[in-house]
């Protein structure tokens, strides 16, 4: 199964949730899952902290084969690399991508707004 994880990962940020990081670790280790990318969104923290924290997590885990993409800063900020990645990846793999969205849903709304098909 090809998966994109859309999340607000703050695993490693003091006094923050760890669920997103654990979700990624589970998906990445599962033999039937191919993680196509991680799209970062705000919620547990701002998009900057979430993005750079996710990059740090990937470095700590020595994972270099999964792209990490930064989402918009606020609701309605739909023109971001995360939105473009979601739209492009789904369009290039029709019917093959499962999006697991566990963050603010801003990237999902942006992808739908950009390309409702």
Residue ranges and their predicted role:
Residues 1-117:
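N-terminal acidic, glycine/proline-rich low-complexity segments
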């Amino acid at each position: 199964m090809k998966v994109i994880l859309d999340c607000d990962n703050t695993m490693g940020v003091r006094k923050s949730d760890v669920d997103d990081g654990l979700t990624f670790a589970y998906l990445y280790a599962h033999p039937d899952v191919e993680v196509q990318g991680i799209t970062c969104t705000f919620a547990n923290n701002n998009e900057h902290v979430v993005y750079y924290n996710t990059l740090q997590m990937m470095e700590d885990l020595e994972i270099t084969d999964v792209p990490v993409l930064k989402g918009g800063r606020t609701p309605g900020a739909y023109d971001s690399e995360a939105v473009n990645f979601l739209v492009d990846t789904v369009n290039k793999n029709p019917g093959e991508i499962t999006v697991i969205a566990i963050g603010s849903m801003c990237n999902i709304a942006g992808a739908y707004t950009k390309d409702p098909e």
